[in-house]
């Protein structure tokens, strides 16, 4: 289980960093095997890895909210939300740190 890195500051996240955050989240999502995570195999998948809906469910956040985060929209996730997303995406401690940096919370 991933733990929260020490919070240093909250800053406004520039556009390019939000885009990098979105690209990072998408890459992690696409790299995961749904069956390995215990998710049922339901029909044919149009995209590799997890669906956004599955990540949102595993992270205990709303689908729309997770989608906006992955799309690089201007949202302000809390530390708890980022930890949930990091756990859902099975991020390493280094990847979790990167997630916090890209979200402007480290």
What are the residue ranges of the model-derived segments?
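Flexible domain-boundary/linker segments
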Residues: 38, 42, 72, 83, ...
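Recognition helix of helix-turn-helix/homeodomain-like DNA-binding domains
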Residues: 42-46, 52-53, 59-76, 86
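Detector for methionine-enriched segments
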Residues: 1-4, 57
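Short N-terminal amphipathic alpha-helices
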Residues: 36, 61-69, 77-80, 94-98
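Short basic helix-loop element that most often maps to the first helix and adjoining turn
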Residues: 14, 19-58
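Short amphipathic recognition helices of helix-turn-helix/homeodomain-type DNA-binding modules
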Residues: 3-27, 77-83, 87-106
């Amino acid at each position: 289980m991933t733990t929260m890195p020490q919070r240093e500051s909250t800053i406004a996240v520039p556009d390019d960093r939000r885009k990098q955050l979105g690209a990072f989240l998408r890459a992690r999502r696409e790299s995961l095997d749904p069956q390995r995570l215990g998710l049922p195999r339901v029909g044919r998948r149009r995209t590799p890895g997890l669906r956004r809906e599955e990540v949102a469910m595993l992270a205990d956040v709303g689908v729309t909210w997770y989608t906006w985060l992955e799309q690089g929209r201007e949202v302000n996730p809390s530390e708890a939300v980022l930890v949930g997303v990091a756990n859902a995406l099975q991020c390493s401690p280094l990847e979790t740190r990167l997630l916090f940096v890209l979200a402007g919370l480290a």
